């Protein structure tokens, strides 16, 4: 990142024979392909968001001021600058100390401004917590909870991208327990109620203690942590018991939750714009996850 405008960056690339892609010049972003690496350059800028939760900048203007650029960002740990020529660190928001403390803190003294401007930052906070094993600072956490309803205004594709990263977070840096950590944070913030209200219905629904230690919702979270890092498998694990609340309400028991769950999961995945192949495979796994592999089920259970 620097004060160079996208036009200046692209002109420099043409002059030096460096391949580049315009990945969002309106937001100051240019992708550079150099010496086998891929780098993103972002121009220092200031953002203006619409009132009422537009979640996308209404206006972007370039700035030569690194401090303006720093305080428009989401978290202090994402607002640390290093001069690649001199090695000098510039840290306007105190991100280095938060990095040492493994803490996610909003750049603004009023975290509600950061979360309210773009509610996807709530999902990003959960993703960073799951990938890095960081904790969220209390004020930032409270602001995220207060702004969670704003996730309803975020595009399904943006929600899906962050959810996928949370589900596969332990594969990023090898930190165990990442998916559960991220999902539990989404539950604590009640963000899960907005992005997957059908799944949130499992909160507090107890199960037979001889088979299940957790309520339906947290059983699903733990199941994600216990399966290999495949997106299809982890989506299936997350949603495999999503039909239990509906089955319980309809029949007073949880039989048929696999079939009900497959239909409910399809609705969730279609709403989040997952590819048809992913929807097909995930719903097939959910529909058949009660299959009696050991042929030990009693006749009345099969009925």
Question: Which role does the model predict for each range below?
Answer:
Residues 1-303:
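Catalytic cores of the polymerase beta-like nucleotidyltransferase superfamily
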């Amino acid at each position: 990142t620097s004060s160079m405008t996208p036009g200046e960056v692209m002109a420099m690339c043409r002059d030096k024979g460096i391949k580049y892609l315009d990945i969002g010049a309106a937001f100051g972003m240019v992708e550079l392909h150099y010496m086998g690496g891929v780098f993103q350059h972002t121009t220092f800028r200031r953002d203006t968001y619409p009132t009422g939760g537009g979640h996308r900048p209404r206006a972007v203007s370039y700035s030569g001021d690194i401090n303006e650029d720093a305080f428009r960002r989401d978290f202090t740990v994402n607002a640390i600058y290093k001069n690649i020529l001199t090695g000098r660190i510039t840290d306007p928001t105190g991100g280095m100390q938060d990095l040492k403390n493994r803490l996610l803190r909003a750049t603004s003294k009023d975290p509600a401004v950061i979360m309210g401007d773009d509610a996807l930052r709530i999902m990003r906070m959960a993703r960073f917590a799951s990938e890095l094993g960081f904790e969220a600072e209390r004020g930032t956490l409270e602001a995220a909870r207060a702004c969670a309803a704003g996730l309803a205004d975020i595009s399904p594709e943006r929600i899906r991208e962050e959810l996928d990263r949370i589900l596969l977070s332990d594969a990023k840096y090898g930190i165990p327990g990442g998916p559960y950590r991220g999902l539990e944070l989404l539950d604590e913030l009640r963000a899960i109620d907005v992005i997957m209200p059908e799944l949130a219905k499992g909160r507090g629904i107890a199960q037979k203690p001889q088979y299940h230690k957790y309520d339906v919702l947290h059983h699903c979270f733990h199941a994600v942590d216990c399966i290999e890092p495949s997106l299809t498998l982890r989506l299936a694990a997350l949603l495999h018991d999503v039909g239990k609340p509906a089955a319980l309400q309809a029949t007073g028991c949880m039989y048929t939750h696999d079939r009900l769950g497959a239909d409910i999961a399809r609705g969730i995945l279609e709403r989040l714009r997952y590819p048809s192949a992913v929807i097909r495979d995930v719903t097939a796994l959910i529909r058949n996850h009660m299959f009696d592999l050991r042929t030990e089920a009693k006749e009345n259970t099969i009925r």
